[in-house]
């Protein structure tokens, strides 16, 4: 961690390929000396998803940079386009799906950064979530 870092370039980002997206972590403790926020740029290929899950100890904002995504918050969903966002309250089940033919790029902003574990809980195999998007390909 660089406690003096206040600016983060593309080369400073911590990259990680999750089962859902290529994650580019721009704000977390090993990147900047932050106390409250996490920021990740997520690059989701066409016909992929981050299936239903929840963050028991964090709130989240999803902000679309490019492409469009099918964003679920609870049992509601909307197609979000560039410049649009969704707020996910702490503990709310949600999922991000890209049923489209173009890449989806979005920012996920989570707080607080130092929340206790578990940070994420998979809900995709539990009802009613397992039935809501069962036609979408499973994450491999």
Q: What would you call each of these model-derived segments?
A:
Residues 23-27, 40-55:
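Conserved short histidine dyad/triad with adjacent acidic residue
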Residues 57, 76, 92-93, 102:
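A generic "binding-loop/recognition-motif" signal
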Residues 41-42, 87, 101-118:
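A short hydrophobic beta-strand segment most commonly corresponding to one strand
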Residues 75-90:
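Short acidic-glycine-tyrosine-enriched beta hairpin
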Residues 51-52, 71-72, 88, 94-100:
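Short beta-strand His + acidic residue motifs that chelate non-heme Fe in jelly-roll/DSBH
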Residues 42, 68, 76-78:
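Well-ordered beta-strand scaffold positions
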Residues 1-36, 122-140:
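A short, N-terminal "cap"/entry segment at the start of jelly-roll beta-barrel domains
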Residues 57-59, 63-69:
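Glycine- and acidic-residue-biased ligand/ion/polar-headgroup-sensing regions
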